[in-house]
């Protein structure tokens, strides 16, 4: 097996503990939606960003200006919650050493995130000093699980998907890696246990990023 040229990480729950309550986020979006829609929308399994896009598109079918206002306010709600959570967030102790070790080994570390850079940098102000590519929400052409998010990062550093590993604490991250043609690893530092990744058949599942790096070293991948 050839050595990896790049490892791209998710941020929240993977490199940092950020207590963001996505269920409460969707409750807030639902309350806002009640102002613009005939009845209060009921949250489903759709992630908050995509759910807001879908709801606002429904409003736009009736009144474009109202739909745009709903979308704008909803995005502000999401960003405010991300920033609030970041104030209580903390970087995992292994994060900086792992990223710096990868660079020293000639493996390009990167981060792609559905979160905004302002929130990420509240937790990790010097993040770009430790990475070779960083694509937060506002810089992404399309967001994971769309593989374009990962492919955008890999293209920026000139690495082919087959020589890269995507790492995250959510099945969405493993799905992103698989769809992009990269290797994929799940870590259980978030809300998902090992069994939550099984249906996607990730290449690796580890208790945290530090444990994953040890496994990659034993496998000769880094």
Q: What is each stretch, according to the model?
A:
Residues 67, 91, 113, 166, ...:
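Charged, low-complexity surface patches
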Residues 18-21, 112, 169, 189:
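Structured loop/turn residues at secondary-structure junctions
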Residues 85-90, 112, 142, 183-184:
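Short, flexible loop segments at the rims of nucleotide/cofactor-binding pockets, characterized by
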Residues 1-96, 100-105, 121:
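N-terminal helical cap/lid subdomain that shapes the substrate entry/recognition surface
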Residues 14, 113-115:
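Conserved phosphate-coupling serine/threonine residues in phosphotransfer and NTP-handling enzymes
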Residues 1-5, 97-104, 117-222:
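Asp-based, Mg2+/Mn2+-dependent phosphohydrolase catalytic module
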């Amino acid at each position: 097996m050839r050595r990896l040229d790049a490892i791209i990480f998710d941020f929240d729950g993977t490199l940092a503990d950020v207590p963001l309550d996505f269920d409460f986020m969707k409750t807030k979006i639902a309350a806002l939606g009640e102002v613009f829609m005939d009845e209060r929308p009921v949250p489903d399994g759709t992630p908050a960003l995509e759910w807001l896009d879908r709801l606002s598109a429904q409003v736009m079918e009736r009144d474009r200006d109202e739909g745009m206002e709903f979308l704008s306010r909803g995005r502000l709600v999401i960003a405010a919650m991300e920033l609030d959570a970041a104030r209580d967030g903390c970087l995992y102790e292994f994060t900086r050493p792992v990223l710096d070790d990868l660079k020293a080994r000639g493996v390009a570390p990167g981060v792609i995130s559905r979160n905004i850079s302002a929130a990420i940098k509240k937790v990790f102000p010097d993040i770009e000093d430790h990475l070779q590519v960083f694509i937060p929400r506002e810089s992404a052409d399309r967001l994971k699980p769309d593989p374009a998010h990962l492919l955008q990062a890999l293209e920026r550093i000139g690495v082919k998907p087959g020589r890269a590993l995507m790492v995250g604490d959510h099945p969405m991250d493993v799905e992103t890696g698989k769809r992009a043609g990269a290797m994929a690893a799940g870590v259980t530092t978030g809300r998902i246990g090992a069994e939550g990744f099984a249906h996607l058949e990730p290449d690796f599942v580890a208790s945290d990023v530090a444990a994953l790096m040890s496994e990659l070293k034993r496998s000769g991948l880094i």
